[in-house]
A protein has these predicted regions:
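Bacterial N-terminal signal peptides that target proteins for export
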Residues: 2-10
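Sec-dependent N-terminal signal peptides
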Residues: 10-16
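N-terminal "domain-start" segment that seeds a small globular fold
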Residues: 27-60, 85
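Short loop/turn microsegments at loop-to-beta-strand junctions
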Residues: 44-45, 67, 162-164
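Short active-site neighborhood of thiol/selenol oxidoreductases, capturing the structured segment around
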Residues: 59-81, 86-87
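Structural microenvironment flanking redox-active thiols in thiol-disulfide oxidoreductases
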Residues: 84-143
Length: 199
């Protein structure tokens, strides 16, 4: 009887020890995925235009990249230079090749590829990442209003274009809008870009 008790006790000690060391084994934490908290608003519009390099560029070419879209025109003396200066700063800050910038002219009659090329050079635009586009005015309106859901100005008045930046993720989903002239919006924009690049 005494032998059985010692044997049982020994088995219990071994079992408890095994459980103790098993439960106290340090496990490597699972890597956390960094995801943006921005909502998925809607699919970005399809479009096609002529770039500052006189090449046809389609929105499908942005697939797999995070991109920022905005509207401007080269003869604009108001918000456009400030907005393009913002984009220039973002281009310099973020070196990721899968971050693109797309500026769409709201004055296609004036903003020929040659005019866009001169304007792009003014802001040191890297043509592999920053595209300025000319497209027919009806396409501009459709892309801006129906596609990106931006406010529409008065008929044929390019001065009334939106000053908002539209941020699109790698799958082509619109994820946010940021006022390109509001200093307080820029840190939020930079955070959004960082988050989407990490997705």
């Amino acid at each position: 009887m005494y032998f059985f008790s010692r044997k049982t006790a020994l088995a219990l000690v071994i079992t408890c020890s095994a459980l103790f060391f098993s439960c106290n084994k340090t496990e490597k934490p699972l890597p956390q995925q960094t995801r943006s908290e921005l909502p998925e608003i809607k699919q970005s519009p399809r479009f096609s235009g002529i770039s500052q390099q006189a090449k046809t560029v389609e929105s499908a070419s942005m697939q797999g990249s995070v991109w920022l879209a905005y509207f401007f025109f080269t003869s604009c003396g108001g918000p456009c230079p400030a907005m393009n200066a913002r984009v220039e700063a973002l281009q310099k800050e973020f070196s990721a090749p899968n971050l693109k910038f797309v500026g769409i002219s709201v004055d296609p009659e004036t903003d020929t590829p040659k005019a866009l090329a001169a304007y792009a050079a003014r802001f040191h635009a890297d043509s592999t990442r920053w595209t300025m586009l000319q497209m027919p005015m009806d396409s501009v309106k459709s892309v801006a209003v129906q596609g990106f859901m931006l406010a529409q100005g008065k008929e044929d008045d390019p001065n009334l274009h939106s000053t908002r930046f539209v941020v699109v993720d790698k799958r082509g989903m619109i994820r946010g809008y940021f006022d390109g002239l509001d200093e307080n919006e820029i840190p939020k924009l930079r955070k959004a870009i960082s988050g989407l690049l990490a997705e």
